[in-house]
Amino acid sequence: MSSSPSPFGQNEWLVEEMYRKFREDPSSVDPSWHEFLVDYNPEPTTDSSASENGQQTRTAAPKAPPEPAPAPAPKTPDSKTPDSKSQAPKQDSKPQESKPQAKAKPAESKSSTKPADAKSEKSGKSGTNGAAKPAAQPADDSDQNQVLRGAAAAVAKNMSASLDVPTATSVRAIPAKLMIDNRVVINNHLKRTRGGKISFTHLIGYAIVAAVKKFPNMNRHFAEVDGKPNAVTPAHTNLGLAIDLQGKDGNRQLVVAAIKKADTMRFGQFIAAYEDIVRRARDGKLTAEDFSGVTISLTNPGTIGTVHSVPRLMRGQGAIIGVGAMEYPAEFQGASEERIADLGIGKLITLTSTYDHRIIQGAESGDFLRTVHQLLLSDDFFDEIFRELGIPYEPVRWRTDNPDSIEDKNARVIELIAAYRNRGHLMADIDPLRLDSNRFRSHPDLDVLTHGLTLWDLDREFKVNGFAGAERKKLRDVLAVLRDAYCRHIGVEYTHILEPEQQQWLQERIEGKHEKPTVAQQKYILSRLNAAEAFETFLQTKYVGQKRFSLEGAETVIPAMDAVIDQCAEHALDEVVIGMPHRGRLNVLANIVGKPYSQIFSEFEGNLNPSQAHGSGDVKYHLGSSGTYLQMFGDNDITVSLTANPSHLEAVDPVMEGLVRAKQDLLDKGDTEDGYTVVPLMLHGDAAFAGQGVVAETLNLALLRGYRTGGTIHLIVNNQIGFTTSPAAAKSSEYCTDVAKMIGAPIFHVNGDDPEAAVWVSRLAVDFRQKFKKDVVIDLLCYRRRGHNEGDDPSMTQPSMYDVIDTKRGVRKSYTEALIGRGDISMKEAEDALRDYQGQLEQVFNEVRELEKHEIEPSESVEADQQIPAKLATAVDKSLLARIGDAHLAVPEGFTVHPRVKPVLEKRREMAYEGKVDWAFAELLALGTMISEGKLVRLSGQDTRRGTFTQRHSVVIDRKTGKEFTPLQLLATDSDGNPTGGKFLVYDSPLSEFAAVGFEYGYSVGNPDAMVLWEAQFGDFINGAQSIIDEFISSGEAKWGQLSDVVLLLPHGHEGQGPDHTSGRIERFLQLWAEGSMTIALPSTPANYFHLLRRHSLDGIQRPLIVFTPKSMLRNKAAVSDIRDFTEQKFRSVLEEPTYTDGDGDRNKVTRILLTSGKIYYELVARKNKESRDDVAIVRIEQLAPLPKRRLAETLDKYPNVEEKFWVQEEPANQGAWPTFGLTLPEMLPDHFTGIKRISRRAMSAPSSGSSKVHAVEQQEILDEAFAP
């Protein structure tokens, strides 16, 4: 037969105690024990020695002797002793199997020194007859005997049994410093994240399990099988933990519970199993299974200060490992901390390996301890642990102390501080997905080893020159500040900023102590997350498959935006204007701007807003809105508006900036501490921020005098993917935000799974903006729960990423668990808040569903919404023209006008009185009259102040001092010196079209009463702003009801300067024109240009004006206007030759009409006059769109004998006005234009020839054909 020890070892006493309780009251024992205890047959708790083969023999309780006497010691049975059943006393006729032996009392040793039991004597059960005599009281100095029962008896029995195990013990002292320092890192991380702690025993226990894999013999135990010695090798390592428990009676008890299959566990699993065993032991919830099968034990007497112990080894185990106290060597225990740190003395911990010498040899035990030693000092061991716990930083490394002087190391510490300030963000834990979980966030510059420092320097003090408010600090404390400031859930880039004051301001706040949000603030953050997630979940459930470009995975955006706006309200600012792409837009509209849910749900139902009945309208995730934000923890409020945007990513950026600048100029608080009270809050996508050039163009405007808005808060929703493009394919830089360094903006990279960090950064960003009036960038790293849209499957292109995302808990859940874990809120409070919000959505949804459904009809044109007045007077008094002329010579005293500019100014005064007004002065006259009428006029563009063609000189520069004089600004006061309210703002723009045009469009939206003009250097370059033209200027009114009256001045004309200095692309604007969306004009006289601008200023409608302006005509002496053309006329959309309107020309002689526009008119007139062609009349169409049908028909009707009509243009056949006019003229006026023919250059892919000689030949051919017989 085989022999084996009890499976419970030293835990057998506990099993018997459980059995006793079970017999008395089964409900008092955990149900997990019931199955085991039903047929449990315990041994009596008498002492017995082991047999020679190690098997303990069961012995019956002896009968009590007839007279009081010490109980004889039981005889040790030999191998032939009958089993306990044959030796049981026959005091009960019932079968012994039905009554467990544990209920029978074992015989007790009687002693004269033990007082008699009063209860026993009274009942007559003392063993004597008659009255009981009082027992004599023992003397104070007499010995007392106490029968060991229960646990104590079991321990005694087990200890006696352990004497049969021949043991030996190996001892090894192990440096504990690395464990200490890495445990600090681990527990600090856990404290900041999910909570919990790692103990030294966790680390040592895991190292023991790892070492057993290398030395499996340490896991074996000895047993005799069929009388033969055997070494039993268990299938797994079951690590027994010695757990000290305090009973209800105050006595301490020791149990050993097993972590089963510990060898198959990773560190995280091991810790979970370890904590589960300890927790259940303390709660009395251990089961029989937990006590059985221990193969190797770990005991830690060091917790009570024991340095070195040799524990007893129980049968069934091969070894027990003892852990001693963690102490400095005895000879240094009286030394000061400073002395110990200077000497590089670390604490030691003593491990003992007590093993069964029958199957384990001393060398093997020694090697085993050496392996544990090596593991606890190895890089790989702690790397594994850090990865398992999700700690993104490298562990502390075991290295030899560097003997360099403290002075040398002081300099290295200063270098280390600088390195963290510069590159700490590279080590920050900012990626919520941690896609490369095996890679630590590290950089050589941030490694203490790189700086010649080691773990031995951690407790040494160094001079830190005021760092964190101290002159001297321990390196450990320095690193704590640096890592908390730069390497947690916020990574900061600010050392690229050139201004020391700004760096210092940020540094103080980043490295300073951060106040934890109050419980009320945490609950508010949670409510914002609830709202963000519930809104998306609701739409996903109710409108399955509909595109909405959800915010799921980036819900922290909502509390972050909320914090920005709240902080702006705290600063008592006037408004926050939001610009953003389509992702998350509906969520922002609902939870930030406050757009009614009913309106959003109606759009999902397909119900059109009555205000958008005209025009094309747009998809719901492009629309804008406005509302009022009320502070949750303050008394202020602030206006919040969201600008409409197209799907062209980042195209809205300059538009929003222009809109904000317009609002600021209306408030007119200036560039002061109290100025810039309208705050731009711009949301971006990561791929777009790095990829779209307009981002850099818009950033470049940030600090320019004519464009600055006092700082934009940029919030990048960094979902680490662009549709299907990975970051590696989307940018060449480390971060998508690197482009923002060009303007010295501080950049904060924030882990989107930490809403408290996002809120802290958002508030800091507003404070920085208010202090320094500069942009701030917040890079919120998150993820996209679904595909680019709700119908997309992103796992086709990013399978690994979406494997992580599909199993990832949302930020609301993780944040809720953190609050509950800290006891800030209860689970019920969290769920109630979420259900309340969901209930609100459900109620509104049901109301919308019940609304009457209207039949969808085709939308109507927006053209009828704004009609140009037919008889608008634009003429001005001659005295006003004279005043504008005088202003050009009213230079300040001592001002030196450039000698080439002075004649221009003098000529202008002359023109104001005598006429022959040229184009440039006619423009200034128009603007000057507007300023005198109280209009704000803003003119900008490349080289605009002087003019590309040296024609404007709107600002005169002092030749000696560089000071400026702006003549038209004098019109801001009337002749009596009273302010008119007008302003003239003229700026040279940066070399940009996209951002510059977008800015001016936005400005015109933000200030509808302003006259906003942008001039291209050459009209050809307007295609750099094509997205703004297509998405905003031509269609903003139709799509969003967004009104603008921006003016684009585009120099245009074929003059032999090549393909890129010829055309403003008339054909493109005419193709885009519809529904009266723009006014497109090509005026040919200075006076008509004057009236065109004034009409646009006075007509009361808000639509863009596109003017194709001249180049060579600027100095054409024929292209001038008389004073009466300004004082008596108005804009004329169709012009005849002066010979027919002001002279004696005979219309009856005309048989051929040449219709044209622009400067070629002057070439046609010159040719006609040269050839005296009275049969040819030239009619100019000055307004190309809307086409002046009535005026054109009236003009043509004046020529009764016309036989042929030609459209003459210098542009190629496929460009200019002809592609539109060739179709629309015969359709609109069939009686007048059926059969009209074209005279032009041939169709060309480029606007013109690159050769001036070829140009001249082509131009001559046009004229020849126009006047051919």
From Swiss-Prot:
Enzyme Commission number(s) of this protein: 2.2.1.5, 4.1.1.71, 1.2.4.2, 2.3.1.61
Cofactor(s) required, per the database record: Mg(2+); thiamine diphosphate
Record-annotated active site: 357 (proton acceptor)
InterPro entries named in the record: 2-oxoacid_DH_actylTfrase (IPR001078), 2-oxogl_dehyd_N (IPR032106), 2oxoglutarate_DH_E1 (IPR011603), CAT-like_dom_sf (IPR023213), DH_E1 (IPR001017), KGD_C_sf (IPR042179), ODO-1/KGD_C (IPR031717), THDP-binding (IPR029061)
SMART domains according to UniProt: Transket_pyr
Biased composition (Polar residues): 43-58
Region of interest (Succinyltransferase E2), ranges: 108-378
Recorded metabolic or biological pathway in which this protein acts: Carbohydrate metabolism; tricarboxylic acid cycle; succinate from 2-oxoglutarate (transferase route): step 1/2; Carbohydrate metabolism; tricarboxylic acid cycle; succinyl-CoA from 2-oxoglutarate (dehydrogenase route): step 1/1
Skewed-composition ranges (Pro residues): 63-75
Annotated region (Linker), positions in chain: 42-107
Gene Ontology cellular component terms for the protein in this record: cytosol; oxoglutarate dehydrogenase complex
Residues in the signal sequence: none
Location of region: 2-oxoglutarate dehydrogenase E1, N-terminal part: 1-41
Subunit structure: Homodimer. The 2-oxoglutarate dehydrogenase (ODH) complex contains multiple copies of three enzymatic components: 2-oxoglutarate dehydrogenase (E1), dihydrolipoamide succinyltransferase (E2) and lipoamide dehydrogenase (E3).
Similarity field: Belongs to the 2-oxoacid dehydrogenase family. Kgd subfamily.
Protein name: Multifunctional 2-oxoglutarate metabolism enzyme
Species name: Mycobacterium sp. (strain KMS)
